[in-house]
A protein has these predicted regions:
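A broad, structural surface signal
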Residues: 25-29, 33-37, 54, 96, ...
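Cytosolic-facing loops and C-terminal tails of multi-pass membrane proteins
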Residues: 73-76, 80-99, 103-110, 128-541
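Basic, amphipathic N-terminal segments
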Residues: 1, 52, 59-62, 70-79, ...
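Post-HEXXH active-site segment of zinc metalloproteases
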Residues: 37-71, 118, 128-138, 143
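Short secondary-structure boundary/capping segments
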Residues: 29, 41-45, 52, 147-155
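Short, well-ordered loop/turn elements at secondary-structure boundaries
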Residues: 5, 20-22, 124-126, 204-205
């Protein structure tokens, strides 16, 4: 904690695979900038002190169990235990306040250390290489994780990758192309505008608990250094290796050797991966004519029968224009901002002030601001509802000109009926999830037993809903053997999750997996029904 320690730096091949030589030099300069900082030792010391205080305050289950045990020995002990507990709780309250102060200062120091390390890198390579790398790394991380997730889902088929890093590169470039991200130096040139394309929020809350500054803050600091340069280097960093592909294959084997396969493994060639990736994207996306309008929005609930009486002229390009898509994400951002402000008001987030649309507000102003935002949100939603009405009328007019027997009204009504049923299923998931939150907390034994008795009725409804999902023809290809087996075990009887003094972990895991799979399947079921409607509409064009 105080004496010097050996400084090790691990560089991931996935990182090397996503940057140029100059960008890698900037990243390494940033890391070595940390090594040169005297504040690193102070930060390490504060971190360890902080960790000790945290364990004293929050990781003390054995102490709580000891107190409960002493209180249960005899009634004569109860009074003394209660008095002692009140004194200890007061001391803990003081320590918690001290912990908050130490932690906030440590986090602030940590953020400053990041800025200083960025400045070190900028002095060595100029700012631009580090800016480009920082902006691209989230795409690189997403691409690498997606490739790994693909094989996690393919475990029953015993597929393994020959070279997961080539798959990472393919996904990264493919995503850049479909999102119209330009290329520079053979790599996607990601910008802040592209990252925040769908973020229309005007709310800015400085997170005093964050250990790293935000990406936007880091880039603004780097740009202010006035040493940005042209992107002269176009050489991929992985060319620094004598045989990068051999290294990638060796590391890929090490990654997949950790997995136990039931049968003989099958190496999945890159061409097959590319084909399956594109098929999966197509399966889980809506037709391109919608321009992303429905990606995070569902058609508004309408009485479409009345809308058949008036048919107007509209253009597809207007109904799904970039302006209409922006309107969708503006409404979503308003809704998120309102929810965040309400959490601040409820003291979920501890802040004294915040910025909204360039103006500083205090916590006491939240209710007034929320009321204004709700009016604005209602206005945006009305605009979107009107656009949905126009969309329906547009496709209805096309259908009437092409088909003798129109079906669009039936498709919409079926979708709206299903939506109402799906909302009930989702509510059931939320209800049970909230009801079992206590298993994550320290809870007295008698309260645990009482809480489990309260969820019996909810579980009964959940099991009914699971049976319906198992019989849904549209979901048969989505229900894996492992999921079906766990469902059937869960449905087989009424399970007990807690004994006298401990949880039955196997039973709990089974129930939590059933609940998680239920949520996945109702989401998938909703997507299937929504896509049926949208595909029918698109097919009319």
């Amino acid at each position: 904690m105080i004496l010097p320690v050996k400084k090790n730096l691990l560089i991931g091949v996935g990182l090397v695979n996503a940057v140029t030589i100059l960008e890698l030099k900037a990243i390494l300069s940033h890391e070595f900038g940390h090594f040169s900082q005297k504040t690193t030792k102070v930060g390490s010391f504060v971190y360890n002190i902080n960790h000790i205080i945290f364990n004293m305050l929050y990781e003390n289950d054995s102490y709580d169990m000891l107190v409960q045990g002493l209180a249960g020995i005899s009634r004569s002990f109860v009074f003394f235990v209660v008095v002692a507990m009140k004194i200890i709780q007061f001391i803990q309250w003081i320590l918690r306040k001290m912990y908050d102060v130490v932690n906030i200062n440590y986090r602030g120091l940590s953020r400053q250390m990041e800025f200083h390390a960025d400045e070190t890198a900028a002095n060595i390579t100029d700012s631009q290489p580090l800016i480009d790398a920082l902006l691209r790394l989230s795409l690189a991380e997403f691409s690498f994780n997606f490739a790994l997730d693909f094989y996690n889902l393919s475990l029953p088929k015993n597929f393994i990758s020959e070279n997961v890093f080539r798959e990472q590169e393919y996904i990264m470039n493919y995503q850049a192309r479909i999102n119209n991200i330009p290329f520079a130096n053979k790599f996607p040139l990601v910008t802040l505008k592209a990252i925040n394309k769908f973020n229309k929020s005007k709310l800015i809350i400085k997170d005093q608990w964050a250990s790293h500054p935000g990406l936007k803050d880091r880039i603004e600091r780097l740009e202010k250094l006035n040493n940005t340069s042209q992107r002269a280097d176009s050489v991929p960093a992985n060319t620094l290796f004598q045989n990068i592909e051999e290294t990638q294959i060796i590391i890929t084997k090490k990654l997949f050797n950790q997995i136990n396969h039931n049968n003989e493994i099958v190496i999945n060639p890159l061409s097959d991966f590319e084909k399956k990736y594109e098929e999966e994207l197509l399966k889980n996306s809506y037709d391109k004519i919608y321009n992303g309008y429905y990606d995070d929005r569902n058609p508004a609930l309408l009485d479409v029968t009345d809308l058949t009486k008036e048919i107007n002229d509209f253009y597809l390009s207007d109904l799904f224009s970039s302006e209409k898509v922006d309107l969708v994400y503006t409404a979503l951002s308003l809704e998120n901002d309102i929810n965040t402000l309400l959490q601040v008001n409820d003291k979920t987030f501890k802040i004294k002030s915040f910025d909204y649309d360039g103006r500083r507000y205090k916590k006491k102003d939240i209710n007034r601001l929320v009321d204004l935002l709700k009016v604005e949100l209602d206005n945006k939603n009305e605009q979107l509802k009107l656009n949905d009405i126009n969309i329906f009328r547009f496709f209805l007019k096309i259908e009437e000109s092409k088909l003798d027997k129109p079906n669009l009204v039936d498709y919409y009504n079926d979708y709206f009926t299903f939506t109402k049923e799906s909302d009930k299923k989702a509510k059931l998931y939320v209800e049970l999830s909230n009801a079992i939150q206590f298993i994550q907390l320290k809870t007295p034994f008698d309260q645990i037993q009482s809480n489990f008795r309260k969820i019996v009725a909810i579980e009964y409804e959940l099991k009914k809903a699971i049976k319906e999902l198992l019989s849904d023809k549209d979901l048969q290809t989505e229900i894996k053997d492992e999921t079906k087996e766990n469902f059937e075990r869960y449905l087989s009887k009424d399970w007990v999750y807690f004994g006298q003094t401990k949880y039955f972990d196997d039973n709990l895991r089974m129930m939590l997996k059933a609940l998680g799979d239920y949520h996945y399947l109702i989401s998938t079921e909703y997507f299937i029904h929504k896509k049926k409607l949208l595909n029918y509409q698109a097919g009319l064009i």
